[in-house]
Design a protein with these regions (language model features):
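Carbohydrate-associated surface elements
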Residues: 170, 191
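Conserved donor-binding/catalytic core segment of Leloir-type glycosyltransferases
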Residues: 212-237, 249, 366
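Conserved acidic donor-binding segment of nucleotide-sugar-dependent glycosyltransferases
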Residues: 336-347, 355-360
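Nucleotide-sugar donor phosphate/pyrophosphate-binding loop at the beta->alpha transition
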Residues: 86-93, 125-130, 138-157
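Short hydrophobic beta-strand element within catalytic cores of glycosyltransferases
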Residues: 293-296, 314-324
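Nucleotide-activated donor-binding/catalytic signature segment of Leloir-type glycosyltransferases, i.e.
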Residues: 251, 259-285
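A short, well-ordered alpha-helix in the C-terminal region of glycosyltransferases
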Residues: 361-375, 387
């Protein structure tokens, strides 16, 4: 198959997300994949120019060695709000170019605006379009003024797609509520790779990070969003009544990076709040192994309500108990008694971690977590995705 992916995030700087895991595995199976992306993080580049030229690059793989993917980043005017108008023009030209020259068998979309363009162009060429949903997309638009418009476009995209895939049941219900025909919706979940976890070295990583044998490490990885709940967890660790053996290990970057660094400057906190910048995917198993409890203390806002982050599956595959806030999507996905312990708010995480460490239940809960996700093998999930693409192509 020839597969064209259209998305509105940075394929190179972000992830690995669901798209990286699936597309790199498809490339390793002999399929050809091209990605049209958008540098959503352009504001963070101090050397940015107003006009960013078109780029075409062969990107190094994030998860599967040798699975190189061609990424095309259309030219864009890097000015607030103007970026959207610029995207409409440059992405339309690029999508038409790729449809006419690359001639994909199927197009897979992860965004809003360029998905709308792709759907229209695919329809005129009788090419199937598959929408893959890992978020309530319009919620991610940073300008509240535009979220209503984005929602309308997103709704239209669901109605016109040949197949709508969701990463969990909560998001499938959301897409149906937004106009997707139920018979055209399916759930293809995130996966796990047990081989990825095989050679993790707990003792070595704990020694590198200055973690003692009896320390209890709460682990978070990913983007440090303001609503991630990490600020509240760190504050509770700082409190005098929190046992000194309770430590927070955060791997990633984002809005809370600087506030966490400030908290570390408080007396005695530098070795209890451990922050590590973005790390290569291959190194993450060591950090997972070094931890004792994994956490998802996110606030129950509109962005987080129905999603299940990939990190949840990776936490659980590592055999770690997970403390999570009561996010409806997560609770619907994993239920109770399956390795996830729920708390009402981020402020309850440290107390619950102390409770688990004292009652001796961590190992048992970790075993249940691993058992819960064992069937989510990435190869099996890729089989399902590959078959779904083949079926939608055959129908056309």
């Amino acid at each position: 198959m020839k597969i064209l992916v259209v998305q509105e995030s940075n394929w190179v700087a972000k992830g690995p997300h669901q798209s990286h895991h699936l597309m790199e595995r498809l490339v390793s199976r002999g399929h050809e994949v091209r990605v049209i992306d958008f540098d959503i993080v352009w504001r963070r580049n101090p050397d940015r120019k107003i006009l960013s030229p078109r780029l075409e690059m062969q990107t190094p793989p994030k998860v599967i060695p040798g699975a190189t993917i061609t990424v095309i980043r259309p030219a864009i005017i890097q000015l607030p709000l103007i970026e959207y108008l610029s995207l409409l023009s440059s992405h339309r030209k690029e999508i038409i170019r790729q449809l006419d020259t690359f001639r994909p068998d199927v197009v897979v979309g992860f965004g809003i605006l360029n998905a709308e363009i792709a759907i229209s162009q695919c329809r005129s060429r009788n090419i199937p379009f598959v929408y893959y949903i890992i978020d309530e997309l319009h919620r991610l638009v940073p300008q509240p003024l535009f979220q209503g418009i984005a929602r309308s476009i997103e709704r239209s995209n669901y109605e016109r797609s040949d197949l709508v895939l969701s990463i969990n049941e909560g998001l499938r219900d959301y897409t149906i509520g937004m106009g997707a025909a139920r018979e055209k919706t399916r759930v293809i979940r995130a996966g796990i790779d047990l081989d990825w976890l095989k050679h993790a070295d707990r003792e070595k990583k704990r020694e590198e990070l200055g973690i003692s044998l009896d320390d209890i490490v709460l682990f978070f990885m990913g983007w440090l969003y303001e609503f991630s709940g990490l600020r509240e967890v760190a504050r509770d660790i700082i409190k005098n009544d929190a046992p000194k053996k309770i430590k927070l290990l955060a791997v990633g970057e984002g809005e809370l990076w600087d506030p966490l660094q400030q908290m570390k400057t408080l007396d005695g906190m530098n070795d209890r709040i451990i922050t590590v910048g973005w790390q290569p995917y291959a190194t993450i198993p060591d950090f997972l192994a070094a931890s004792d409890i994994c956490i998802l203390p996110a606030k129950n806002n509109e962005i987080m309500r129905n999603i299940v982050p990939i990190k949840m599956y990776e936490y659980m595959a590592a055999g770690k108990p997970v403390i999570a806030t009561k996010l409806p999507g997560v609770m619907k996905e994993f239920g109770t008694g399956n390795g996830v312990v729920y708390v009402d708010d981020a402020e309850d995480v440290v107390h619950k971690a102390i409770e688990l460490s004292q009652n001796g239940s961590m190992a048992e809960i970790g075993v249940k977590a691993r058992q819960c996700v064992l069937s989510n093998d990435w190869n099996t999930i890729t089989d399902t995705f590959e078959k779904a693409l083949g079926e939608v192509i055959h129908v056309r």
